[in-house]
């Protein structure tokens, strides 16, 4: 479930130069010029943040159940671009994509003009783990002097350093770049610990026997919510075609709400609609069960009684995390220069299309 500080780091680094050009010249494509197909539906492109997984499941459900069609939309779900979904949305290659407020903030400081219009995940799911067979690591302070399997982001370095220091360590560690997977890097003993997600890799570990010893960010001094996963679009689309944004958000919201209340059926839909991902139904069902039981998308009782609107952006939790990253000097601009001021979460998120 690669959505932020792990797998996206390479895409963020690779798109810096492109963003410099975008900041200077504006968006190269007009994503609001959506064409109508023969049935009168408006064609819309949604880009994955990584491989198909339960983070994306609501979009697949919305397409399968006809929610997009009912809204007058013909949605094409496409693979993530090499430069990342955020860059694709920023320059108009995709109308919408899955991302998170953390990434939106990072890209905004590099010149992107994008916003999150719906937040699916409401609490952190990142877990930082060693193999259970590694008896030298009993808590984060034992990461001191060990080797971190990383995708190369300043963000993950800041998180690990804070967790180690909160647990009484110095916050010093070596790093090795992950190859094909963090699991493989740890198993080959090229690294001692790495990052995973409880709702995806954590489920894989439980089901397929690779036992992990894991620690969570909130327990070790990392404030706010880093994992504010949701749907993004660009500022130009919001200003010039708000009706399109509202239709897409409303239909997508309906898809995620269905998945949250019908997790097994939604799992079957994801497996069917994303055949190239070769997902196992039992695994996807367990991932959804983890999401529902952990209330990762919000408290179902509050959603049902209307005291919480599904999809609301947690700008408070995001800002707490942004401020932490700024304190740790984890932000840089499009030229690689350190930025000491955190992005303002309230300026890169909107709930106006949820209503």
Please tell me what each predicted stretch does.
Residues 315-355:
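Conserved C-terminal helix/tail region of periplasmic/extracytoplasmic solute-binding proteins
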Residues 102-103, 181-185, 189-276:
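Pocket-lining segment of extracytoplasmic ligand-binding domains
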Residues 241-328:
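Secondary-structure end/capping motifs
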Residues 1-43, 351-355:
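Short, low-complexity disordered leader/linker segments with a strong preference
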Residues 33-179, 183-188, 192-199, 214-215:
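Short, glycine-/small- and polar/acidic-enriched structural segments
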Residues 77, 116, 175, 259-270, ...:
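Surface-exposed patches in mature extracellular/periplasmic domains of secreted proteins
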Residues 170-174, 276-291, 331-345:
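Short, surface-exposed acidic
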């Amino acid at each position: 479930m690669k959505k932020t500080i792990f797998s996206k780091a390479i895409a963020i680094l690779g798109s810096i130069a492109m963003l410099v050009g975008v900041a200077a010249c504006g968006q190269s494509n007009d994503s609001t010029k959506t064409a109508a197909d023969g049935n009168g539906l408006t064609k819309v492109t949604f880009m994955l943040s990584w491989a198909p997984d339960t983070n994306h499941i609501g979009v697949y459900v919305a397409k399968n159940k006809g929610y997009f069609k009912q809204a007058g939309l013909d949605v094409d779900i496409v693979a993530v671009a090499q430069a990342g979904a955020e860059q694709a949305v920023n320059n108009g290659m995709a109308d919408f994509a899955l991302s998170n407020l953390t990434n939106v903030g990072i890209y905004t400081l590099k010149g992107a003009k994008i916003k999150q219009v719906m937040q699916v995940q409401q609490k952190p799911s990142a877990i930082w783990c060693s193999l259970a067979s590694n008896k030298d690591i009993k808590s984060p302070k034992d990461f001191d002097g060990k080797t971190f399997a990383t995708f190369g982001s300043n963000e993950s370095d800041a998180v690990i350093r804070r967790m180690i220091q909160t647990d009484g360590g110095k916050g010093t560690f070596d790093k090795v770049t992950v190859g094909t997977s963090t699991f493989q890097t740890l198993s080959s003993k090229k690294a001692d610990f790495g990052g995973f997600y409880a709702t995806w890799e954590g489920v894989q570990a439980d089901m397929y026997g690779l036992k992990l010893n894991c620690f969570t960010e909130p327990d070790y001094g990392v404030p706010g919510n880093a994992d504010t996963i949701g749907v993004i679009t660009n500022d130009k689309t919001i200003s010039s075609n708000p009706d399109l944004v509202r239709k897409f958000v409303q239909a997508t919201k309906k898809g995620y709400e269905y998945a949250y209340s019908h997790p097994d059926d939604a799992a079957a839909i994801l497996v069917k609609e994303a055949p190239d991902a070769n997902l196992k139904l039992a695994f996807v069902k367990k991932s959804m069960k983890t999401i529902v039981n952990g209330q990762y998308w919000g408290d179902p009782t509050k959603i049902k009684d209307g005291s919480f609107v599904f999809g609301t952006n947690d700008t408070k939790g995001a800002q707490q995390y942004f401020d932490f990253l700024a304190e740790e000097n984890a932000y840089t601009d499009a030229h690689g220069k350190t930025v000491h001021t955190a992005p303002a979460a309230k300026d890169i998120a909107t709930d106006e299309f949820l209503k």
